[in-house]
């Protein structure tokens, strides 16, 4: 993992991120405290008014709620936004940084959806892709809360797997890194 530092990105000072290459780049950022706090507060304060996102997501998770959807209205989901402009601007700035870091130019960006997966014991998300209305797109995970324990590891306890995020790569070959299980902390993105 390499650490890079940029001076400014759309008023984001000292943008720090980690980098892993899995056939495509995976960048790991730390969310500013004000953005992190805003998302958590909005989720908790509006929980009863948030649209369930379970019908359109693959996760085997009871509590999946949408904070933002800006796509075509569907039977499963209609356009809505509970997030203030500074939060959606943060997402867009990070996605634009990702594209610039990878030297991807002339790529139109559209923020399609933001939701919360509130996972409990025995719930999981199978391997899947995110693509919105297109076959290409950027996907992200932000850590808003973590439990005090992920439970007992029933096998290979020296290699912790419970509650881990696993990102699968698009590379092959003898020395290729094919997956990444980042250590997760609050505010990781």
Predicted regions and their residues:
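N-terminal amphipathic/basic-hydrophobic helices that include classical n-h-c signal peptides
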Residues: 1-11
């Amino acid at each position: 993992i390499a650490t890079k530092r940029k001076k400014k990105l759309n008023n984001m000072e000292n943008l720090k991120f980690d980098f892993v290459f899995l056939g495509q780049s995976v960048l790991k950022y730390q969310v500013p405290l004000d953005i992190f706090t805003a998302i958590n507060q909005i989720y908790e304060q509006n929980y009863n008014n948030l649209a369930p996102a379970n019908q359109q997501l693959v996760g085997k998770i009871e509590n999946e709620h949408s904070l933002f959807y800006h796509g075509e209205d569907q039977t499963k989901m209609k356009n809505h936004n509970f997030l203030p402009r500074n939060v959606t601007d943060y997402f867009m700035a990070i996605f634009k940084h990702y594209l610039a870091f990878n030297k991807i130019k002339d790529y139109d960006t559209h923020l399609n959806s933001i939701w919360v997966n509130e996972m409990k014991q025995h719930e999981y998300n199978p391997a899947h892709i995110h693509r919105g209305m297109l076959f290409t797109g950027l996907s992200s995970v932000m850590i808003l809360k973590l439990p005090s324990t992920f439970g007992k590891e029933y096998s290979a306890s020296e290699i912790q797997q419970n509650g881990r995020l696993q990102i699968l790569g698009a590379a092959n070959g003898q020395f290729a890194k094919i997956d990444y299980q980042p250590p997760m902390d609050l505010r990781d993105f």
